[in-house]
Amino acid sequence: KTSEKRKHASELSHPFKADYNDHFETSLQAYTDIAPLLDLYAAKLGKTRKTLVIYDPYFCAGSTVSYLNELGFAIVHNTNTDCYKVWQHQQTPMYDVLLTNPPFSGDHKEKCLKQCVAMKKAWVVLLPSYCATKNYL
């Protein structure tokens, strides 16, 4: 199943250069594990899963929206756009929390974390464990 998704993602046309090895969609289980944290943050804002606005700037094949919708999160921005151009032109959609699993190749992780800090909004970034020992900022 994972290889099918990976093949599908790599066959999509993207408006940005995409490394084949970066085409791994975040699993439903990962979102299920994060959902209680999102619930706590939503409650702090006086919102629910239906009204919390989630932004994932890194598009792969589109499962982010369907998985989060399946968990009851109704407003999810994850479009097939070049997030670096979106950020450069200050066209980031309005959101309550940024939730993403950035590509692991190149300097995507660093760019992502710098943007998260610069936006001064809530964020959750899924990274491999080896990143815990790195100083990206």
Language-model segments: which ranges?
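Class I S-adenosyl-L-methionine-dependent methyltransferase catalytic core
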Residues: 1-137
